[in-house]
């Protein structure tokens, strides 16, 4: 709707990766283990020197892969878009960063994560990342969207509240820096979390938990004496499931979810709305 020209999206996405190590950009410098991490390694009898060497090798590896891929595509756009007009060239219209889980759950790198500024290192790394991407792509004012992690949706008063609040704040913080005013925007994704699917997922997990309780002969459940056969366990679970998840909810979940919570339940509706929000933010920055 906004452009008559073609739009090429260059995607690089490796799961289970961190910003503090895997996507750490050059100007962020080397990863520094904190004293608590080093003490823990020594207590566990691990080879600290080897850990440090391995960390150096891993640091920035996926940043380099990402940049190499982007540059490879831009060097031969016709390979992926045969109708590309070389005489007109291309314009780098924006960059979207959507990540976070592996940093948020890392107690080692962020030992004070439940405290204010507990994720300050993430903010620093993200700021360096933006600068380095712009430098390496020769696009000093490249519009940049930070997709603020929204797993779990609106934050409620739970024991994990501080962690989620602090991490989301750290992700969004670079957009408030004066140097990024007007060309870096933090876009919350929590509003697009599917609360209905999440509620059903919680009940489905109760069924899975019951399966585990029977299988492990948990002392507080029906198979505590281990007398139930596998057939009897399946029959028990079938009956239990009917009391926890009705057919309509099961069908809703089957239709709407395809992955775990940390992947937004694999909900296409959620992802579509997030993608639209990112695109809308980029368009508004360019106006």
Segment roles from a protein language model:
Residues 1-287:
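Cell-envelope and extracellular/periplasmic
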């Amino acid at each position: 709707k906004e452009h008559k020209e073609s739009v090429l999206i260059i995607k690089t996405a490796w799961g289970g990766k961190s910003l503090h190590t895997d996507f750490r950009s050059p100007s962020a410098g080397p990863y520094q283990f904190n004293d608590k991490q080093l003490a823990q390694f020594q207590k566990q009898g691990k080879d600290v020197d080897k850990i440090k060497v391995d960390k150096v090798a891993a640091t920035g590896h996926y940043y380099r892969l990402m940049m190499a891929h982007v540059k490879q595509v831009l060097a031969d756009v016709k390979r992926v878009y045969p109708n590309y007009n070389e005489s007109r060239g291309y314009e780098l219209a924006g960059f979207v960063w959507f990540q976070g889980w592996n940093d948020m759950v890392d107690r080692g790198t962020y030992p004070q994560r439940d405290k204010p500024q507990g994720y300050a290192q993430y903010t620093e790394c993200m700021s360096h990342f933006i600068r380095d991407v712009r430098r390496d792509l020769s696009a000093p004012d490249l519009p940049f969207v930070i997709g603020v992690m929204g797993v779990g949706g609106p934050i409620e008063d739970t024991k994990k509240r501080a962690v989620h609040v602090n991490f989301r704040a750290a992700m969004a913080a670079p957009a408030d820096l004066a140097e990024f005013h007007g060309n870096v925007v933090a876009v919350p994704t929590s509003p697009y979390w599917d609360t209905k699917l999440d509620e059903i997922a919680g009940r489905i997990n109760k069924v899975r938990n019951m399966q585990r309780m029977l299988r492990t002969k948990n002392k507080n459940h029906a198979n505590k004496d281990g007398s139930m056969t596998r057939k009897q366990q399946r029959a028990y679970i079938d009956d239990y499931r009917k009391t926890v998840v009705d057919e309509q909810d099961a069908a809703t979940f089957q239709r709407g979810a395809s992955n775990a919570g940390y992947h937004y339940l694999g909900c296409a509706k959620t992802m579509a709305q997030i993608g639209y929000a990112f695109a809308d933010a980029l368009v508004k920055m360019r106006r």
